[in-house]
Amino acid sequence: MAARALCMLGLVLALLSSSSAEEYVGLSANQCAVPAKDRVDCGYPHVTPKECNNRGCCFDSRIPGVPWCFKPLQEAECTF
């Protein structure tokens, strides 16, 4: 029974973490398609996706060691 509960908890945590990996509220995915090496930090340590988006920035935590909250591309810079 305890093993099943641990499996369920792991599944829930995995789903929650994957759903917040990239957030583009109010921005297009193209605006947030900034290569990791070109990201300009827009947040602060431990910024949440919601706080980042409220600043008008993109949030993507999939790549360690680079800013997760970063300035979006302007529409003219977007690569379609």
UniProtKB/Swiss-Prot annotation:
Cell location: Secreted, Extracellular space, Extracellular matrix; Cytoplasm
Occurrences of domain P-type (ranges): 30-73
A Pfam family this chain is assigned to: Trefoil
Disulfide bonds, paired cysteine numbers: C32-C58, C42-C57, C52-C69
SUPFAM superfamilies noted in UniProt: Trefoil (SSF57492)
Keyword Oxidoreductase belongs to the record: no
Predominant location: secreted
Tissue-wise expression: Expressed in goblet cells of the intestines and colon (at protein level). Expressed by goblet cells of small and large intestinal epithelia and also by the uterus. Also expressed in the hypothalamus where it is detected in paraventricular, periventricular and supraoptic nuclei (at protein level).
InterPro entries found in the cross-reference section: P_trefoil_chordata, P_trefoil_CS, P_trefoil_dom, P_trefoil_dom_sf
Signal peptide region: 1-21
Gene Ontology CC: one annotated term: extracellular region
Keywords carried by this UniProt record: Cytoplasm, Disulfide bond, Extracellular matrix, Secreted, Signal
Subunit annotation: Monomer. Homodimer; disulfide-linked.
Record-level GO BP terms: maintenance of gastrointestinal epithelium; regulation of glucose metabolic process
Naturally occurring in which organism (per UniProt): Homo sapiens
Molecular function as annotated in GO: identical protein binding
Presence of keyword Cytoplasm: yes
Entry protein name: Trefoil factor 3
Gene3D superfamilies in the cross-refs: Spasmolytic Protein, domain 1 (4.10.110.10)
Function, as annotated: Involved in the maintenance and repair of the intestinal mucosa. Promotes the mobility of epithelial cells in healing processes (motogen).
